[in-house]
Structure formats: structure tokens, C-alpha cells
Amino acid sequence: MKHILLITGAGKGIGRAIALEFARAARHHPDFEPVLVLSSRTAADLEKISLECRAEGALTDTITADISDMADVRRLTTHIVERYGHIDCLVNNAGVGRFGALSDLTEEDFDYTMNTNLKGTFFLTQALFALMERQHSGHIFFITSVAATKAFRHSSIYCMSKFGQRGLVETMRLYARKCNVRITDVQPGAVYTPMWGKVDDEMQALMMMPEDIAAPVVQAYLQPSRTVVEEIILRPTSGDIQDD
């Protein structure tokens, strides 16, 4: 059975790992035929991950989009509706961050972070949940962060955006439970992704890898539709990496 899955931020990091994990899952689940709709700001990244997923036997569809741009959100939504007519899974993974001391952060840092993490995530979810509500099925993942429930000194704007996402998650559950839609909040701690920039070997050794997040996401999706994994919290074994 074909499953239409949209993954935002699929070109790098956690999104890329989730796409590959879904592609590989079909080997062990004969009734699961993923159609991976992969979205990212960078076409070259999408082309690469698309080829990797196809090598695993999955069908792929790529669309370059920046979810901080409302025109791109509308285009992405229209693409799903017109090409497929339904959607089984939305992985809200696209996210950005600007970090620094409170006094150093700017209005541009604020807008850059909020436009993707909150505005884009909200309006994409709003549009595609309407489709799930009509079809009375679906699953939405929010890749938030441990920073959705815990503050970090040099992450004030990022924490605000993630606390906000957490509010959206809880609100969506109130709607989703009435129409058989599953909502899963995934809260990773430190994961070695491009968002961290250059880190030394000692710090990298303390961090999780994107694959560590991808496997539980796919496992949660493949649960029977009568069951929802509401929250997945993953941290490095050594705990959170502090920024003070």
C-alpha cells in the first residue's frame, strides 16, 4: 500500500536520515510502499537524497521550497493536493537557529528563526491537517527539541521558537483526536548536524547522530493506526550539552 509522506528539511541532517530510514523500512514491511515527497531549500541536496532513497527501492518526488516563504508553503500544499489528493504523513523537520548572548541577537535573527520554526511550520501544518481531517487519517511529526521544554542561555530565540512549537503540538492534539490523526512530538537533544557548524572531535563524540533520531520516528509511524506514540525524547547518554 502506497504511503504519501512529506518530509521538510529533507536535504540534510535529521530530515535526510528520516527519509533514508523510511526508504529502508519497506524491506521489512512488505505492505509499506513509501512515496517520499522530499522538500528542502537546496536543489542539489534534494537530488542527492532522492537518488539514495531510490537506490533503497522507494519512490521519490522532490520540491525545492523554503517554508519561511508563504508562497512556497502554498506551492508545496498545492503540489500535494493536485498530484496525490491525500497525504499519510507530514514530518515537520525544517528548522533553523541563530545563537548567541541575549544582548547580541538582532531583529533579523528573530525573524529568520520565527519565520521558519513557527510561521512556516504553523501554516504548512494548518493546510495539510485540513486534508487529513477530511480523509480521517494521517500522522504529523513535529521535530522540536529538548529546547522546547528547557532553556539554554545562548539559545533564547531558538528556545522561544521551540516552546512555541510545543504549544502548537498540544493544540493540534485537541483537533487530531477527533478525526483519527496521530500527532508525535520528537524532542532530540544534541545531534551532530550542520546547524552546529564546526565542532571539535571531543564534543562530536558526546552528540547523537541523525540516524539515532530517524529510527524511532519510523517505528512510531509504523505502529498500528489505533496506537499513537505521542512523545519521543532522545538525549545523548552523557546528557544535554550546556552552553554556559
From Swiss-Prot:
InterPro entries cross-referenced by the UniProt entry: NAD(P)-bd_dom_sf, SDR_fam
Localization: Cytoplasm
GO cellular component: a single term: cytoplasm
Pfam family for this entry, one: adh_short
EC number annotated for this UniProt entry: 1.1.1.325
Binding site for substrate: F99, S145, Y158, W196
Catalytic activity line of the entry: L-threo-7,8-dihydrobiopterin + NADP(+) = L-sepiapterin + NADPH + H(+); L-threo-tetrahydrobiopterin + 2 NADP(+) = 6-pyruvoyl-5,6,7,8-tetrahydropterin + 2 NADPH + 2 H(+)
Entries under Gene3D superfamilies matching the protein: NAD(P)-binding Rossmann-like Domain
Quaternary structure annotation from Swiss-Prot or TrEMBL: Homodimer.
Similarity comment text for this entry: Belongs to the short-chain dehydrogenases/reductases (SDR) family.
The name this protein goes by in its record: Sepiapterin reductase
Annotated source species: Chlorobaculum tepidum (strain ATCC 49652 / DSM 12025 / NBRC 103806 / TLS) (Chlorobium tepidum)
